């Protein structure tokens, strides 16, 4: 149940519960929260997992950091305050997807541990699967698919995570994926197996 600081705004319960929606899916809805440096492989893994789930007939969706900034978060910049608001909004959107019975993958750098923990806090136990997409900065910088590291090194992008702004590594993530060691297919199978193990209570 949500809360509001406006006393005249009340929460309306849905006629179809989250549990009823989950029973129609083959996997319990949750947020698979991919976090890591730019270029670590978050979006690649999120979309590969989404494809795997789709092919298995499981309702799923990807919330991608770049895509969200084209719409919902178009007005936000990259200051610490705006980054926090970016993640707060995504957490709320992801929660709605979970309530709809959808396995939701999110691909955001989400550099601050507190922000990730806040998202975990608004979800039920077991619904936030933190996946640390771990990759050495040197490797991410070599990949640099968007040319962002080059711009950050030259000073064109201020407060760039890993260069001029910190990335706070997860302390106890549900999964760690080393993308400089695992192929995409191997990583997806590892995540997929984890989700099914959670479903069966193993």
Curated annotation (Swiss-Prot):
Active site annotation, chain numbering: 110
Record-listed ATP binding positions: 36-43
Record field: catalytic activity: adenosine 5'-phosphosulfate + ATP = 3'-phosphoadenylyl sulfate + ADP + H(+)
Enzyme nomenclature, EC number: 2.7.1.25
GO molecular function annotation: adenylylsulfate kinase activity; ATP binding
Alphabetical keyword list: ATP-binding, Kinase, Nucleotide-binding, Phosphoprotein, Transferase
Family: Belongs to the APS kinase family.
Name this polypeptide is given: Probable adenylyl-sulfate kinase
Lineage: superkingdom: Bacteria
Record has Membrane as a keyword: no
Pathway: Sulfur metabolism; hydrogen sulfide biosynthesis; sulfite from sulfate: step 2/3
NCBIfam families: apsK (TIGR00455), PRK03846.1 (NF003013)
InterPro entries reported in the protein's UniProt record: APS_kinase, P-loop_NTPase
Alphabetical list of SUPFAM superfamilies matching this protein: P-loop containing nucleoside triphosphate hydrolases (SSF52540)
Function: Catalyzes the synthesis of activated sulfate.
Keyword Nucleotide-binding on entry: yes
Gene Ontology terms describing biological process: hydrogen sulfide biosynthetic process; sulfate assimilation
